[in-house]
Amino acid sequence: MPGPMGGGRRRQMGAKPKVKNPGKILGRILGYTFKNYKIHMIIVFICIIVSVLANVQGTLFIQSLIDDYITPLMNTSSPDFTPLLFAMARVAGFYLLGAASTFAYSKLMVYVTQGTMRNLRIDIFSHMESLPIKFFDTHSHGDIMSVYTNDIDTLRQMISQSMVQLFSSTITIVSVLVSMISISIPLTLLTLVMVAVMFIVSGKIGGKSSKYFTAQQDDLGKVNGYIEEMMNGQKVVKVFNHESKAVEEFNELNDKLFDSAYNANKFANILMPINAQLGNISYVLCAIVGGVLAFNHFAGLTLGGLVAFMTFNKNFSQPINQISMQLNSIIMALAGADRIFKLLDEKPEEDDGYVNLVNAKIVDGKIEPSEERTGVWAWKHTHSEDGATEYRQLKGDLVMDDVDFGYTDDKMVLHNIDLYAKPGQKIAFVGSTGAGKTTITNLINRFYDIQDGKIRYDGININKIKKADLRRSLGIVLQETHLFTDTVMENIRYGRLDATDEEVIAAAKLANADSFIRKLPHGYDTVLTGDGGNLSQGQRQMLAIARAAVANPPALILDEATSSIDTRTEKIVQDGMDKLMKGRTTFVIAHRLSTVRNSDCIIVLEHGRIIEKGTHEQLIEQKGKYYQLYTGKTA
């Protein structure tokens, strides 16, 4: 469905409504649970078995209590209640043991469940951080957030409740069935007939609700994704007066969620009452038939045996009802787990690079590694042939040689890109929106890999450079600056986490940010919230420049860094940028062409191709596309 401005939204996770391989998914869930809590789970299962057997034994002893203690006392003129009291204490002991075991495994399961959820969240987040930029460009952020909230929560409920209940109910059914057979085979057969009816009903209703529970999780993710998208784009929505359109689209998604949730819970909620009524019918039938059998002493059935059997009858139908109830929770949890594991199964960003970036020093004209920050950087290249290590100084020389690129293999967006940036040069990319300016910088960072051609950094194919080291060598200042909920000091320090306070302040001064920072309520200790919403766009960009400055990178990428601020602020920001760019190879993308006049080379792009290249003066003389963009006139 199109977004509020007609474009398609990012695709959602878990697009197919049916969970594939539920057994495999359940196995992975159990694997996560047992991985760190094997001993705890063994104790839990032992406690469950003890609890069930204690309760069954207590119920089974009721037969002896009535037949061997209560009935004889009724025919005695001077009864001695001492044996009865001891027998009652024995029954109470069984039930107390069962209660203690239940308390123990319930408390343990809280610890196991929360620990498993903690580990799972860590694994999800760690894996998410290893994913390529392409994943976040093609998936709804709100849908990803739904994995951390809704899907994790449904899985938590399954592990803490459904899994334990399923095991407990299974043990209860088996032990109760054996006990019922020992009391009366005819009544047991009657009970099993009613149980068979329950299973048939549960299968029919459960089958209908299964697909809707899966769809419910997917639709919930879509609603969350849309809300997140609209919150981020609220200014755009209001500028274009698309509030009613946004509400209309939200209602459409919300209605789909209503339909799937209604259908899922409609079938799920009628399952327990139906099974409860079938259980009541089974109880009444067994009471009538059992009364007749006990009255006639058929097959050795006594009054005590009948009372015990009727208790077991209730205990037998109850776990079956619980299983049918938990099956719906398990189905929902499997749908959530499916989305979780789809995220975990996303392929991490590949990195086959082996050239590292290291601090270096020059000794007798030679490059050597240094343990300290010297301001000199070098590429450490260990040759696989002979194991020799070569150090090559990082100068910022970058070459793109006949590069072709497409976000998909069947549609190229860059064609035959050739450029050469000498160390310390300022290279500017200009062109219409969608011409390919930002795409080129994404290739330099290796956020995406090219289909054809070569990109060399200081003569080294960038595919050979480890991505983390490549990106460490490139400072980035984006138009949309992302600030974290933390102090101004820590937001700047994010550029280099081991930077001292003095280095952070020096970087802020270089970016011309120091003066406005000191006017904030708590200066550098002011906590920014809401992505720095209380700062102006210019102030946010100054912090971005300071963040890049504290990293002290050898090269820079300035992506449309001053296209949305006023002229006065732009001069302040531009002055900070000029200080930052000094002595560094810099790639600039700007809508205000006045900011790139002093570039060493201006590259004009159109439809993914370089159509002009040269200095400002040279391009003005050519009176081509750049001339049109700069002057607004046609040659």
List the predicted regions and their residue ranges.
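Membrane-integrated ABC transporters
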Residues: 1-55, 70-91, 105-109, 113, ...
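Juxtamembrane helix-loop junctions of ABC transporter transmembrane domains
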Residues: 15-22, 54-70, 85, 93-141, ...
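Hydrophobic alpha-helical transmembrane segments of ABC transporter permease domains
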Residues: 27, 46, 101, 105, ...
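An intracellular "coupling" helix at the cytosolic face of ABC transporter transmembrane type-1 domains
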Residues: 35-38, 133-134, 152-159, 163, ...
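Transmembrane helices of ABC transporter permease
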Residues: 36, 40-53, 91-94, 161-215, ...
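Helix-loop-helix
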Residues: 72, 179-193, 263, 267-338, ...
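ABC-type nucleotide-binding domain
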Residues: 77, 360-635
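Helix-loop junctions and hydrophobic alpha-helical segments within the transmembrane domains
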Residues: 124, 128, 237, 340, ...
